[in-house]
Swiss-Prot record:
Zn(2+) binds at C209, C212, C241, C244. It catalyses: Hydrolysis of an N(4)-(acetyl-beta-D-glucosaminyl)asparagine residue in which the glucosamine residue may be further glycosylated, to yield a (substituted) N-acetyl-beta-D-glucosaminylamine and a peptide containing an aspartate residue. This is Peptide-N(4)-(N-acetyl-beta-glucosaminyl)asparagine amidase. It is found in: Cytoplasm. Its cofactor is Zn(2+). It comes from Oryza sativa subsp. japonica (Rice). Binds 1 zinc ion per subunit. GO terms for cellular component: cytosol. Belongs to the transglutaminase-like superfamily. PNGase family. Its main location: cytoplasm.
Length: 447
């Protein structure tokens, strides 16, 4: 932490005539560049997003990578002009176009997809899709619990709303947004809810001993007690203490109301409870089931006009390639589940669709679509015509988005992290498992 005094020159010497104005800024380098921009804004009325700060001594541009402790005190402020904004927008548009596959590469991908579909016919299991249905439909009961007004009120009472709202507004102000729209405020609050949840929920590899608080090891499964079954814990893991040999129970609760109390678990409990929180604050939210070994959340962003990925275990948002590119996961089925039905959203999370197709062997693609449509139709049957039309229009827009997503180029310059949640031992075990993540079905509970 270093206290600095900068002299910021504004105007003059730029061909526009007039004397340069000088402003002195007292600044603590610990606070970061965003705070410096806000201080300059208070003196010059140039919004942070339109500021270009240049070191007068060498002409270098001050950015997030600049060592603010080492530069000279003389700074020059240049307001970005409309022409520069247009140039930046044009460059961004060109970069977006460059992301799309070349015609030749796209043709290769489509051919590989057709070949994968052909081979899939010889690999799929001929059970009429019953296994697939059994892995998806039970989760509808799970997500419908999120709609209980009493549960939602209990959830809201556990959240420091005033604190998160303040943090949301501060985050917007740091971006130069001092008069945010409702959609912008809602979006910022959602991100603060994610960050808060990440800090307030506890990951469990092996629970501490109930008797002495020391480390335990798994010794198998136990029979659920009536008090545990009441809150959906059909599976109970049993652990023995390394020191006092006492046993500790770890019920895998499914009722999000109970998770408000326990505030612990693995990815199943984390995603279950966080999706419930999102619904409790009025966000359109879906539980996302990855058939390999993970669960997370999606919320519909009115700000972006699309569904947005959020992973409470990792504290990550809007980064759907995290699993394939960062974790090196071999995805097969990624299914979104909400009160309004179920959707296959696998294409959002892959840029290797033809490879994913080769692993989708539970049933045919037509059967997958038919089962999902059947489940969705069942849970939308009571909707009004207007409500149904709105959902169908949103589904259509999402289908178009997903169709394009699988053929977009991966930005190789972006490095995504591997999995952070869970111990190394647990992560290794998890990679060997492909069970149902929440304990509403049978399985050994890798998730």
């Amino acid at each position: 932490m270093v206290a600095r005094r900068f002299v910021v020159r504004q105007g003059g010497g730029g061909g526009g005539g007039g004397e340069a104005e000088e402003h002195e800024v007292e600044y603590d380098t610990e606070h970061g560049l965003d705070i410096l921009r806000l201080q300059i804004f208070s003196l010059t009325s140039v919004p942070p997003e339109l500021q270009k700060i240049v070191v007068e001594a060498d002409g270098s541009v001050v950015d997030d990578g600049t060592d603010l402790e080492a530069i000279s005190e003389g700074l020059r402020l240049v307001a970005i002009t409309g022409e520069e904004e247009e140039a930046e927008a044009a460059a961004a548009a060109e970069a977006a176009r460059a992301q799309e596959k070349s015609d030749e590469e796209l043709a290769r991908m489509i051919q590989a997809e057709e070949e994968a579909l052909l081979l899939q016919q010889y690999s799929i299991r001929n059970d009429g899709g019953e296994e697939f249905r059994e892995r998806v439909e039970p989760y509808m009961h799970q997500v419908l619990m999120y709609e209980d007004p009493m549960r939602q009120e209990a959830a809201r009472k556990t959240v420091p709303m005033d604190e998160l709202q303040e943090k949301a507004l501060v985050s917007l102000a740091k971006e130069g947004n001092f008069s945010p729209s409702k959609d912008e405020e809602d979006h910022a609050f959602l991100l603060q809810l994610l960050f808060w949840f990440k800090q307030s929920f506890r990951w469990v590899n092996a629970p501490p001993c109930d008797s002495c608080g020391r480390e335990t090891f798994n010794v198998g499964m136990g029979t659920a007690l009536p008090s545990e079954i009441k809150f959906g814990a059909n599976r109970v893991e049993i652990y023995r203490c390394n020191y006092c040999s006492s046993t500790t129970r770890f019920p895998r609760y499914n009722d999000p109301y109970k998770l408000l109390e326990t505030r612990k678990g693995r990815c199943g409990e984390w995603a279950n409870c966080f999706t419930f929180y999102c619904r409790s604050f009025g966000y359109e939210a879906r539980l996302i089931l990855d058939f390999t070994d993970h669960v997370w959340t999606e919320c519909f962003s009115n700000l972006y006009g699309r569904w947005m990925h959020l992973d409470p275990c990792e504290g990550v948002y809007d980064n759907p390639l995290l699993y394939e590119k960062g974790w090196n996961k071999k995805l097969d089925y990624v299914i979104a589940i909400s009160k309004d039905g179920v959707r296959d959203v696998t294409k959002r999370y892959t840029r290797k669709w033809h490879e994913v197709l080769s692993r989708r062997i539970i049933t045919s693609e037509d059967t997958v679509s038919a089962i999902l449509s059947s489940i969705t139709g069942k849970y939308r049957s009571g909707l009004s015509i207007d409500g149904l039309t709105a959902l169908e229009n949103r589904d259509k827009k999402e289908s178009e988005e997903l169709s394009k997503a699988a053929y977009l180029e991966v930005d190789t310059s972006i490095s995504l992290p591997g999995r952070q949640s869970g111990s190394v031992e647990w992560r290794k075990a998890s990679q060997k498992c492909s069970t149902y993540i929440l304990s509403i079905t049978s399985g050994n509970g890798c998730g």
